[in-house]
Amino acid sequence: MQDAITAILNRYDLTGRYLDKAAVTQLESFFSSGLDRIKIAEIINNQATNILKEASAQLYEEQPELLRPGGNSYTTRRYAACLRDIEYYLRYTSYALIAGNTNILDQRVLNGLKDTYNSLSVPLAPTVRSIQLLQEIIEEELELQSITRKDIVQEPFQHLINALSEQDL
């Protein structure tokens, strides 16, 4: 896993350059958002169960066919696997959020996920929708707590959504 600082330093080290104004600006942005990153991670940590419960309830309300015979969440085992996966998305996005870098999402979530889901005939659209719901629920909570830095939340969630939505992975 890389954080934003390591990514910047590695990029400049590979080219043998000192940090320029662009690098310093990126570092300043990361450090200035640090307190908000911690607050958002605390919200996710403290409310993970409720966030997961609300996201799954909304998903199954919107797409009840997932719970019917033949649906990908039909049977207790499949339902539990779906909830487990939604929890993984939430947990790993919280790590990426703190790190200010989506590298961990590529390493631990995306590499092989799409192929695995396709081989098991797990539809990607409900997966993408569950990630969107997680993002929306967290953003609503940020509004309630007067935290305005939604971009911090959007970056890791949108990274997952965009990667899983691509046609040519």
Swiss-Prot record:
One of its GO terms (cellular component) is phycobilisome. One of its GO terms (biological process) is photosynthesis. SUPFAM superfamilies: Globin-like. It is found in: Plastid, Chloroplast thylakoid membrane. It is a peripheral membrane protein. Contains one covalently linked bilin chromophore. The modification N4-methylasparagine is found at residue 72. Signal peptide: none annotated. Its main location: plastid. Keywords: Antenna complex, Bile pigment, Chloroplast, Chromophore, Electron transport, Membrane, Methylation, Photosynthesis, Phycobilisome, Plastid, Thylakoid, Transport. PANTHER family: ALLOPHYCOCYANIN BETA CHAIN, PHYCOBILISOME 32.1 KDA LINKER POLYPEPTIDE, PHYCOCYANIN-ASSOCIATED, ROD 2-RELATED. Light-harvesting photosynthetic bile pigment-protein from the phycobiliprotein complex. Allophycocyanin has a maximum absorption at approximately 650 nanometers. Heterodimer of an alpha and a beta chain. Belongs to the phycobiliprotein family. This is Allophycocyanin subunit beta-18. The gene is apcF.
